[in-house]
Swiss-Prot record:
Reactions catalysed: UTP + L-glutamine + ATP + H2O = CTP + L-glutamate + ADP + phosphate + 2 H(+); L-glutamine + H2O = L-glutamate + NH4(+); UTP + NH4(+) + ATP = CTP + ADP + phosphate + 2 H(+)
UniProt cross-references to HAMAP family, sorted A to Z: PyrG
Swiss-Prot/TrEMBL keywords: ATP-binding, Glutamine amidotransferase, Ligase, Magnesium, Metal-binding, Nucleotide-binding, Pyrimidine biosynthesis
Pathway(s) served: Pyrimidine metabolism; CTP biosynthesis via de novo pathway; CTP from UDP: step 2/2
Chain sites annotated for binding UTP: 13, 186-191, 222
Organism of this sequence: Rhodopseudomonas palustris (strain BisB5)
Name of the protein described by the UniProt record: CTP synthase
Binding positions for Mg(2+) per the UniProt entry: 71, 139
Enzyme superclass (EC): ligase
Extra remark: CTPSs have evolved a hybrid strategy for distinguishing between UTP and CTP. The overlapping regions of the product feedback inhibitory and substrate sites recognize a common feature in both compounds, the triphosphate moiety. To differentiate isosteric substrate and product pyrimidine rings, an additional pocket far from the expected kinase/ligase catalytic site, specifically recognizes the cytosine and ribose portions of the product inhibitor.
């Protein structure tokens, strides 16, 4: 039977509960346990799919097509276990399910209330589908004291009483701020955070304390005394230079030992952390460096590109180099020459996005990369803009554009209306809702034999990648574009939807309709990112 670890946060938001959960999951996994990580999000949206990147950050897409919180990306990267739509739920989804049942008459006329109906729905979600796992780690989004989080805290309080004694523990992630004028770490915010947690019936078993310096023994003793936890359960979570150093740091601080002790499990062997040590050595001691320009439209919010940043880092690990990122707002190129911004970089990456703002700037970035032989990686929207650039400047289709931006006489990119998922035909219309109407999740793509991308993948002819898009390159222009050198080297198996384009006579120019960053892992870097960084490294030695 699975044991449950609930991770809560206090004092301030954005402390890194998702990263802490992922790191603990990796440590337990390194001890031979099977782990599952799940996330409860208290917001009222059904999912983050229609939320602004500036509000929410990245939308992480799973193989089964769920649009989820970016923390699920941390879970996958640290444990290697693919997440599913059953690993993330929001208040919105819970209320939708409850109200659907109420309209159907399932509650037989009962008054629907937060307790027991909402809390029971949360408990049912948390406790379902966990057979075969040793530990289930559940992160509760937000901060203790948030009004929208109260039903979730009540539900996890009840779960401890519902399950056998010793099958549930609570870990509270908190902040110890350093006050320079006083010259000390302050414990009072943590004390008040734990007081708030205890007032709703939850006594944390472990305090995970974010800090930028060692916790003195006296502060550790004070936290244990006033927060009612063992002194050994006050764990120091020091700031790290790399997120991949966190599992080793947490082990050194005793987190995994304390978790096992809380469950009365004897820690017989230390965790096998050799592979973590190996990649951290590569990160700390690179043999070179490359600079990649990310030409995007959400560059002011780095969390909007979280998986992308990590995938580039993985490419650097594979090539033993440091990857430096130069963030460029794509709108800049609509009024200025891109050369001064891009001449010094070793590679250009244009990521996914939606809407017309900044599109012309991305087209200019693709043109610069093509004309100057700079390695170019276009992802989703970045592929579409590269195709429009080729149509305008190589094929002579001056009015080439995307219908996403409005009516056009030359729709190089248009709205998909139907596609195959397995053997089933899925349909969409222009008038459909924005939420949940995209081509989402894992789909296969057939690669052309002998193409660059086929070689990058190891000479395979079919791959499976995750998608999140509503628009697609128009195959009516395929022949004209190929006549001018843009090769369609990957298509959907039925030959209807373009998946990959490339230039054969370019050092490295690949556009993909899918999101390869979502499947990259530190121990298994995605081949496209490894190859892209390798090409950037070659260029760095030429200029």
């Amino acid at each position: 039977m699975a044991r449950y670890i609930f991770i809560t946060g206090g004092v301030v938001s954005s402390l890194g509960k998702g990263l802490a959960s992922a790191a603990l999951g990796a440590l337990l996994q390194a001890r031979g346990y099977k782990v599952r990580l799940r996330k409860l999000d208290p917001y009222l949206n059904l999912d983050p799919g229609t939320m602004s990147p500036y509000q929410h950050g990245e939308v992480f897409v799973t193989d089964d097509g769920a649009e989820t919180d970016l923390d699920l990306g941390h879970y996958e990267r640290f444990t290697g276990r693919p997440a599913t739509k059953q690993d993330n739920i929001t208040t919105g989804r819970i209320y939708q399910d409850i109200l659907t049942k109420e309209r159907r008459g399932d509650y037989l006329g009962a008054t629907i209330q937060v307790i027991p109906h909402v809390t029971n729905a949360i408990k049912e979600f948390v406790l379902s589908g966990n057979d075969g796992y040793d530990f289930v780690l559940v992160e509760i989004g937000g901060t203790v004291g948030d009004i929208e989080g109260l039903p979730f805290f009540e539900a996890i309080r009840q779960i401890r009483n519902d399950l056998p004694r010793g099958d549930v523990i609570y870990i509270h992630l908190t902040l110890l701020p350093y006050i320079p004028s006083a010259g000390e770490l302050k414990t009072k915010p943590t004390q008040h955070s734990v007081k708030e947690l205890r007032s709703i019936g939850i006594q944390p078993d472990i305090l995970l304390c974010r800090t930028d310096r060692p916790i003195p023994k006296e502060e550790r003793r004070k936290l244990g005394l006033f927060c009612n936890v063992r002194e050994t359960a006050v764990i120091e979570a020091r700031d790290a230079d790399s997120i991949y150093a966190v599992p080793e740091a947490y082990h050194a601080a005793g987190l995994d030992d304390e978790v096992l002790a809380a469950f009365a499990i004897a820690a017989e062997e230390p965790p096998a952390l050799e592979r973590w040590h190996k990649i951290n050595e590569r990160i700390r001691n690179p043999e070179g460096a490359v600079t990649i320009a990310i030409v995007g439209k959400y560059t002011g919010m780095k969390d909007a590109y979280k998986s992308l940043i990590e995938a580039l880092s993985h490419g650097g690990i594979a090539n033993k180099v440091e990857v430096k990122l130069d963030w460029i707002e794509s709108e800049v190129f609509e009024n200025e020459d891109p050369a001064p911004f891009l001449e010094h970089v070793n590679g250009i990456l244009v990521p996914g996005g939606f809407g017309q703002r900044g599109a012309e700037g991305k087209i200019e970035a693709a043109r610069f990369a093509r004309e100057r032989d700079v390695p170019y990686f276009g992802i989703c929207f970045g592929m579409q803009m590269a195709v429009i650039e080729a149509a305008r400047n190589l094929a002579g289709i001056a009015e080439a554009n995307s219908t996403e931006f409005g009516p056009t006489s030359e729709p190089l990119v248009g709205l998909m209306t139907e596609w195959l998922r397995g053997n089933e035909l899925e349909r969409r219309s222009q008038a459909g809702d924005l939420g949940g109407t995209m081509r989402l999740g894992a789909y296969p793509a057939a690669l052309k034999r002998g193409s660059r991308v086929s070689k990058v993948y190891g000479d395979v002819l079919e791959i499976s990648e995750r998608h999140r898009h509503r628009y697609e390159v128009n195959t009516a222009y395929k022949d004209r574009l190929e006549q001018h050198g843009l090769r369609f080297s990957g298509m959907s198996p039925d030959g209807v939807l373009p998946e990959i384009v490339e230039y054969e006579d370019h050092p490295w120019f690949i556009g993909v309709q899918f999101h390869p960053e979502l499947k990259s892992r530190p121990f298994e870097p995605h081949p496209l990112f490894s190859s892209f960084i390798e090409a950037a490294l070659v260029r760095s030695r030429l200029v």
